[in-house]
């Protein structure tokens, strides 16, 4: 029998709730659903009503998502319906109360004068969601979102290289280090959190796409709880749990070896520069208009001046000069403009500091603080401590 029409596992679930909270929860869970599910039921969201309210769940054996919302439960029970269809419907409804109930082998959804009847799927075929590991620590939700966003930008997208598609999460007591790389750039963020145990030590690799989605749209509220386990069991479940403010998700950890990244970070620079982020970003986008997609933008640094240039005679040339604080020998270096603006957008500060060694070796970008004083002399210059670095490989200069 077709899974969409079977009545097995249906209940008399009936509830009423406000559209806004329902739409937010369904949309969040639906984003975790696979676009091409291995079996049809994995495209569904499970709605479960109890005396405590309504729980909306999704799971594809890799990623799970669960959200709890307040609802008037007239009749408890569970039902499974298409997640993306339900999400599209509730987001388009007017801001009025929603009445939802099981009607035979279908569900009815009414809101204002709008009425929908949707087919159901077999609840008994739906997998059980994994249990969250023990809590490992907590941190503010806004800090979590910022830090993940800063490193996820550098993660690889090639699934044939799984070690590059993840974010390395290293935990040592109250310190967390996040790192990601696609071989062309490396982003590292260090932050402080509230560890469940002061002597906890762990290092895991988490899928960057899932973690970025959770950080970007997932947990609202004051704190996020990360669950990898506790004591000697940290990471042993092969799961990372993220929870807070009525939402929780899990993702399987990647079983791959992340590159040894610390040895890539230079301890000193032969030249350094500090410049306004917004002005530099705007100038890069402007001169890159004459460059083919992915072509280089050249940066010529000298005392007090930066000249940006791109293009060639056959496609057109562009140049722009900017003021810069620069110390060291004059330097010409070139970068992929997209990777460069990604890094500038991730430093989250008004000014950015560049550290260079040679035109053929990676440049280091970090936030420039108000306390940074322009260096003097000809170098070398020691790399200053920072909680965020973006290491970017240059591209080969012509000739």
UniProtKB/Swiss-Prot annotation:
GO terms for molecular function: 3'-5' exonuclease activity; DNA binding; DNA-directed DNA polymerase activity. GO terms for cellular component: cytoplasm; DNA polymerase III complex. GO terms for biological process: DNA strand elongation involved in DNA replication. CDD domains: beta_clamp. The keyword DNA-binding applies. Keywords: Cytoplasm, DNA replication, DNA-binding, DNA-directed DNA polymerase, Nucleotidyltransferase, Transferase. It comes from the Bacteria. Pfam families: DNA_pol3_beta, DNA_pol3_beta_2, DNA_pol3_beta_3. Confers DNA tethering and processivity to DNA polymerases and other proteins. Acts as a clamp, forming a ring around DNA (a reaction catalyzed by the clamp-loading complex) which diffuses in an ATP-independent manner freely and bidirectionally along dsDNA. Initially characterized for its ability to contact the catalytic subunit of DNA polymerase III (Pol III), a complex, multichain enzyme responsible for most of the replicative synthesis in bacteria; Pol III exhibits 3'-5' exonuclease proofreading activity. Belongs to the beta sliding clamp family. This is Beta sliding clamp. It comes from Mycolicibacterium paratuberculosis (strain ATCC BAA-968 / K-10). The gene is dnaN.
